Curated annotation (Swiss-Prot):
It comes from Leptospira interrogans serogroup Icterohaemorrhagiae serovar Lai (strain 56601). CDD domains: CTPS_N, GATase1_CTP_Synthase. The active site is at C384 (nucleophile), H510, E512. This is CTP synthase. InterPro entries: Class_I_gatase-like, CTP_synthase, CTP_synthase_N, GATASE, GATase1_CTP_Synthase, P-loop_NTPase. CTP binds at S15, D150, I151, E152, K190, T191, K192, P193, T194, Q195, K226.
C-alpha cells in the first residue's frame, strides 16, 4: 500500500444523494492541490456488472478503456479528474462472491469453512489494495454504494471498519453523505434523520470523520453545532452541500468554499498545498455566461430516464462550453415519431443525435428522425445503434434497398446492411461478451471526421455486437455515404459520413465516454459548432 491513503464515502437517510458526484468533486479538489488520486466504486448488487441491467434499473452503462461495463458514477470520476479508470475501479458483490467461490472450488481455502468474515471482507479489501499497489496514488477515494442500513452493504462497511482498525485514522478517513430534509409545514431543516444514520454507522463500528449534509439551503452555524454535538464530529467537519440548480460542475467550487478538501487534508495530517483551481473555475464561468443557445434533439428509447444517457448529455454540454453555447435538450421518444408527427416534433431543433441502444423498440422512429436530419441539412450525430440506423435509413431511401435492416432487428431481412460481428457468432453468454473497450480507428484524410479529430489514428471505446456489412460498402460509397473511418486492418467500419450534408456523422463507437468539461470531445464540439451555424440560418 506504501503511501496511499483511503477516503471512504458512505451514504445515509436516502439514496440518490450524489455520492458519486461528491467523490468526483473531492478528487477534483485534491488534484487541484497537486495530489494524485484514484477513485473506486463498490456496488452491493449481486450482478457481476451492470452490463445486462435495464437502464430503467441502473441508468447508463459506462465503459472503461479496458472494456469493463461499469456504473455511471465512473463517468463522473473520469470527467472531474485526470484518472484513467479500469475494471479494477468497479467492484460488485457479484464479483467478490464469484472470486471467493471459484477459490473454494479450487481448494484454495484448504478445507476451511468459507464465511462472510473473513473471506468476503478480505476479498473486498484486496480489491482496494490492488489499486493502491498498481497505481500508487496519494489518495484512493472509495464510494460505498447503497445506503447505510441496507443489508447488502454490511460486508463492505465491515471491510472498511477493519481497514481503519488496521491502518489508523491518519491513513483511513470516513466521509458520510447524508440528507437534512426541510419540512415545508414547519419551515425548518431537521437533523434527526442524520443523527439516526450516524447512530446506525456507529453500531457497525464506524465513526464518521466528516459529515456532508445535503440541504435545500445553506446550513446555519446552529445546525452545524447541533450535528457536531450529537454525531461526535468536529463542527468544522460538518459540510453544507446545498442544492445547485445550474450545473453539476459548480459542485467542486461549492465544496471548495466549504473547505472540504482542507478539512480532509488537515484530518489526515497532510500538507495543505496551494490550490490551482483556475482551469476549472474558468470552465464553470464560461458555462454560466453563454452567448447563445441551441436546441438538440436526443432521440432514444430510454429518454424518460435522465441517467440513461448521462454521458451523452454531459458531452453535449461540453461541446457547448467549447463554443460559448448553452445546449437545451429536446428529449424525443422515438415511439412518438411517425409520418404524421415527426416534422412537427423536430422542426425547431438545430441538431439531432441518436444514441446507442439495443432492441427493436423505437427503431422506425429513430430512422424517421435521421431521414428528417438528412433531407433538411440538420446536423446529425449517430452513435453505435444511431450510426446503424443511419446506414439503414440511407439504404432504404437513397439506395432503394427497401428491405434494408439490421439482423438484430429483422434476422431474415433481404438486405442485411448491418449484421452480427463474425466473432460473436458462437457466443451464447450475454454478459460481458460484446466488443468492449478502446480500439484504434484509422480516419481517412480529407473527411469531416479528420477535420474534427485532426488525426489519422484515434482510439475510441466500443460496446456493440453488430457492424456495417462489408459487402455493401462499395454501393454506399458510390452513392454518397462514405466510409470515413475503419479498424486499422480495414475490416470493420467505424465512421460513416455524407460529404454533401452540412454535418452528418455516424460512429460505431461511444465518443461520450472520453469527453471532459475542460477538454470537450472533438465530435461533440464539432456537432455543436455545426448546430450553432444551422441555428443562425433563420
Amino acid at each position: 500500500m506504501s503511501r496511499t491513503k483511503f477516503i471512504f464515502v458512505t451514504g445515509g437517510v436516502s439514496s440518490s444523494l450524489g455520492k458519486g458526484v461528491t467523490v468526483a468533486a473531492l478528487g477534483c479538489l485534491l488534484e487541484s492541490r497537486g495530489y494524485t488520486v484514484s477513485l473506486q466504486k463498490m456496488d452491493p448488487y449481486i450482478n457481476i456488472d451492470p452490463g445486462t441491467m435495464s437502464p430503467y434499473q441502473h441508468g447508463e452503462v459506462y465503459v472503461t478503456a479496458d472494456g469493463a461495463e461499469t456504473d455511471l458514477d465512473l463517468g463522473y470520476y473520469e470527467r472531474f479528474t485526470h484518472s484513467k479508470l479500469t475494471r479494477k475501479n468497479s467492484v460488485s458483490t457479484g464479483q467478490i462472491y464469484n472470486t471467493v467461490i471459484q477459490r473454494e472450488r479450487k481448494g484454495d481455502y484448504l478445507g476451511r469453512t468459507v464465511q462472510v468474515v473473513p473471506h468476503i471482507t478480505n476479498e473486498i479489501r484486496n480489491r482496494m489494495y490492488i489499486v493502491a499497489r498498481e497505481e500508487n496514488p496519494d489518495f484512493i477515494i472509495v464510494e460505498i454504494g447503497g445506503t447505510v442500513g441496507d443489508i447488502e452493504s454490511i460486508p463492505f462497511l465491515e471491510a472498511i471498519r477493519q481497514m481503519r482498525y488496521e491502518h489508523g485514522s491518519s491513513n483511513v478517513l470516513f466521509v458520510h453523505l447524508t440528507l437534512v430534509p426541510t419540512i415545508t409545514a414547519a419551515g425548518e431543516a431537521k437533523t434527526k434523520p442524520t443523527q439516526h444514520s450516524v447512530k446506525e454507522l456507529l453500531g457497525l463500528g464506524i465513526q464518521p470523520d466528516i459529515l456532508v449534509c445535503r440541504v435545500s439551503q445553506p446550513m446555519t452555524k446552529e445546525m452545524k453545532n447541533k450535528l457536531s454535538l450529537f454525531c461526535n464530529v468536529k463542527e468544522e467537519n460538518v459540510i453544507s452541500a446545498s442544492d445547485i440548480s445550474t450545473s453539476i460542475y459548480e459542485i467542486p467550487k461549492m465544496y471548495k468554499e466549504e473547505k472540504l478538501d482542507e478539512v480532509v487534508l488537515k484530518t489526515m495530517g497532510m500538507e495543505l498545498r496551494e490550490s490551482n483551481f483556475s482551469e476549472w473555475d474558468k470552465m464553470v464561468k464560461g458555462l454560466l455566461t453563454t452567448k447563445q443557445t441551441v436546441q438538440i434533439a436526443v432521440v432514444g428509447k430510454y429518454i424518460s430516464l435522465q441517467d440513461a444517457y448521462r454521458s451523452i448529455y454531459e458531452s453535449l454540454s461540453h461541446g457547448g462550453i467549447a463554443h460559448d453555447t448553452k445546449v437545451e435538450f429536446i428529449k424525443v421518444d422515438p415511439e412518438n415519431l411517425n409520418k404524421d408527427s415527426y416534422v412537427e416534433i423536430l422542426k425547431k431543433v438545430h441538431g439531432i443525435l441518436v444514441p446507442g441502444g439495443f432492441g427493436d423498440r423505437g427503431i422506425e422512429g429513430k430512422i424517421l428522425a435521421i431521414q428528417y436530419a438528412r433531407t433538411n441539412g440538420i446536423p446529425f450525430l449517430g452513435i453505435c445503434l444511431g450510426m446503424q440506423c443511419a446506414v439503414v435509413e440511407y439504404g432504404r431511401n437513397v439506395l432503394g434497398l427497401k428491405d434494408a435492416n439490421s439482423t438484430e432487428i429483422r434476422p431474415d431481412t433481404e438486405h442485411p446492411v448491418i449484421s452480427l460481428l463474425e466473432e460473436q457468432n458462437d457466443i451464447e453468454q450475454m454478459g460481458g461478451t460484446m466488443r468492449l473497450g478502446s480500439y484504434p480507428c484509422k480516419v481517412k484524410e480529407n473527411t469531416l471526421s479528420y477535420s474534427e479529430y485532426k488525426s489519422i489514428l484515434i482510439h475510441e471505446r466500443h460496446r456493440h455486437r453488430f457492424e456495417f456489412t462489408n459487402r455493401y460498402r462499395k454501393q454506399y460509397e458510390e452513392n454518397g455515404m462514405i466510409i470515413a473511418g475503419t479498424s486499422p486492418d480495414d475490416n470493420l467500419v467505424e465512421i460513416v459520413e455524407i460529404p454533401k450534408h452540412n454535418w452528418f456523422i455516424g460512429v460505431q463507437f461511444h465518443p461520450e465516454f472520453q469527453s471532459k468539461p475542460t477538454l470537450p470531445h472533438p465530435l461533440f464540439a464539432g456537432f455543436i459548432r455545426a448546430s450553432v451555424k444551422y441555428s443562425k440560418k433563420g
